[in-house]
Amino acid sequence: MIAGRRHFDCRPLHLAGNINYEPTVWSRADALKVNENDPTTTQPLVSADFPVMSDTVFIWDTMPLRELDGTVVSVNGWSVILTLTADRHPNDPQYLDANGRYDIKRDWEDRHGRARMCYWYSRTGKDWIFGGRVMAEGVSPTTREWAGTPILLNDKGDIDLYYTCVTPGAAIAKVRGRIVTSDQGVELEDFTLVKKLFEANGTYYQTEAQNSSWNFRDPSPFIDPNDGKLYMVFEGNVAGERGSHTVGAAELGPVPPGHEDVGGARFQVGCIGLAVAKDLSGEEWEILPPLVTAVGVNDQTERPHYVFQDGKYYLFTISHKFTYAEGLTGPDGVYGFVGEHLFGPYRPMNASGLVLGNPPEQPFQTYSHCVMPNGLVTSFIDSVPTEGEDYRIGGTEAPTVRILLKGDRSFVQEEYDYGYIPAMKDVTLS
C-alpha cells in the first residue's frame, strides 16, 4: 500500500531552486499492519549476561564515522564511533537508595540531562577503546550534546560533526575538527568552534513556543546520488500549536470499519525533516518541508538516515511504543520507508513501516538503531529482564544484526558480536 500525501503550503525556496513536493503520509492504516510477532522483523533476544564496554560511563546513541554517501570508514586502520555518553555515579549520594546501594536505574534514567559526545576507537571494529570527549567543556553553547553524524571530509583527516545543541532550545549545529592517528590509538582534535545552522521555523516544523515538548534534533547529512547536492534529514514535529492538528482522510488512510475514531491522536505529529545546503561546504542551509509525516500515528521519528541501494532510497528512522498515537501500537525499533526519488513518494516498508523491532518478551532491550549500507544494524542495550519484575540496565553496545533489503521488504539475518561495527573502507591519511 502506498502511503498518502499531505499538502504543505511551500513558500519560495532560495537555495533549493524549483524543488516542489508533498510529504508522504505514514497513515494509521499503514501502522495498523505493524506485527510485533513477525520473526522477519524481530530482533533476536539479548541475553541478560551481556558484557559492558565501560564500568565508568553509560553510552547510548552510536554514530559511526562515515562519508557523505553513508560509507562507514576507518582511518589508517582505526575504526571510530561517537556515542552519547554520561558518567556512571555509583558513589554519588544522589544515586544511593535507602540502604546505601547504587540505584543504577535512576542514574540511567537521568542520563539525557548530562549527555556528552565522546569517541571510541578500535582495530577490530569491536573491542572499543574510550578516547574521551569530542568537545572540551564549554565549547558547545548548550548544556546538552545530543545525537548527530560525524563525517570524514577528506584524506587530510578533517571531520564535520553535525549534532544537536539542546537546552536552552534545540538547534542543528556542526563543529569541525580532525582525526590524528598513531600506532597506539586515535585522537580527535580542534573541535573548538560550533556553528549553529538552523532551528525549527514554526512554518514546517513545530517550535518550542508551539509545543513545549517539541522534537527537533538528530541531523544526518548526505549527498543525493542523483543530483549530487548536499542534504540533511532530521527529526521534527509538524508545525502548529499543540493539539491543533487534524487527523483527516489522508492521515487515516483506508482503515477498516471500527477504526475511524482516533481519540487524542492529534497530539502525535512526528515527521522526518529535510534541509538543503547552498553548496558542499555545508555552511549555509535552507529548511524544506518534511519528507514523511506521522500526524495521528507517532510523535517521534528519531535519528533518520538513508541507505541507497538498487536505485532506491531507503529512509530509516527509530521510534518508541510509548510515542504511538491512541489506538495504535508497535515495538521500539527501526521503521523504514522506500522510494525511487529523494522527494518521494515513499512506501512504508513491509507495508507497515516496521523493519526491526524488539521482541514482545523484551520490549526495551535495545534502541537507537543505525542501519549501515552493508546491512549491519547497530544499537545500544537499554534494559533486559532478569528475575521476576527485575531487569538489568545496559548503557552499552548491543549485538549487531544484519538485515536484508529486498525491494519494499526487509528480513532479519545473522547476529554478530556486541558492538561490531566494521569499516566498509579504510582511508589512509595523506
From Swiss-Prot:
What's a single GO MF annotation on this record?
A: levansucrase activity
Which additional comment does the entry carry?
Strain KL103 contains two functional levansucrases, Lscbeta and Lscgamma. A third copy, lscalpha, is non-coding because of a premature stop codon. Lscbeta and Lscgamma show different sucrose splitting and polymerization properties, and differential expression, suggesting two distinct roles in the physiology of the bacterium.
Catalysed conversion reaction: [6)-beta-D-fructofuranosyl-(2->](n) alpha-D-glucopyranoside + sucrose = [6)-beta-D-fructofuranosyl-(2->](n+1) alpha-D-glucopyranoside + D-glucose
What is the gene called? lscgamma
The identity of this protein, by name, is Levansucrase Lscgamma
Share what the entry says about its subunit structure, partners included: Homodimer.
Task: List the Gene3D superfamilies hit by this protein, alphabetically.
Answer: Glycosyl hydrolase domain, family 43
Q: Which family does it belong to?
A: Belongs to the glycosyl hydrolase 68 family.
